[in-house]
Amino acid sequence: MSRNAKVGLVALVAVLIGIVLLGCAATAVGAALPGLGAGLGRKVAIVRVEGPISLASGNTWLLSTSATDRRVIADLHKAEADPSVAAILLYVNSPGGSVVASDEIYRAVKGCKKPVVAYFAEVAASGGYYISCGAKRIVAHPDTMTGSIGVISEIVMAKGLLDKLGVTVETVKSGPAKDMGSPARPLTPEEREILQGLIDEAYQNFVDVVAAGRNLPREQVLRLADGRVYSGRQALELGLVDQLGSMDDAVMAAGGLAGLKGVPQTKEMRSQASLMEVLLGAITKPDPVSALQQRLYPSLEYRLAP
């Protein structure tokens, strides 16, 4: 190799090393100063919570289009780790759902180091409102349906159908309440009292979360938390949201909290499944019978109900 060729090769390697070091430095600065973003790519991440809020099942959460706790939390973590993201917009269009899944998402939202603004679209009720109490600010469309602060548990009663079909269920149990919630028989007064106690406990937690997140007196929240829904306008008057507006207004609010000037760029956050994860999700997807059995189990929900 000639001397000129060697010099050219060394120069090329030096340039490549310099580019890598500059990239690493930019990433480090973006991570350390999330409000500054990365270069010109200062963006507001959009994390969507659409449909019923549910607990993830196996690997199927990667294939789900609904608001499973693991998918939403994964999207939040992705936004937190992205150096081009300065703030997060939590887009909520959900009637709520699982008590546990709602609480998991709420904790993830509250724990975000980057500012989070929640935006209420058509409906952000019950669990949809619960998760938003972890955000720094809530922007609601004037005609959104929100509120529905409360807990519900529904048990399918199939005794009449089983009787018509001539099906009987024989149960051997260790205690009188072991089969509480069985669709083959109604609840006893004692079992109803037990279930009511669980509902009341989850309800008190809901009230505490709203009081803390919205900086409202607990007594005031209790007066609002009878399960009714509120429009965005009513919610603003009651202190349940911070402002009325569109999604664009919410993006501007998120950018403002991050110190961004002008209209921020947005970036959709959605965890993508690998080919292996898609295959595993298809294999482990619950069959219809198992899915029906899960619906028959007693459960507590922060959910808008008719």
Model segments located where?
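N-terminal organellar transit peptides
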Residues: 1-118, 122-127, 137-141, 152-306
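Extracytoplasmic ligand-binding site segments that recognize negatively charged/polar headgroups
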Residues: 148
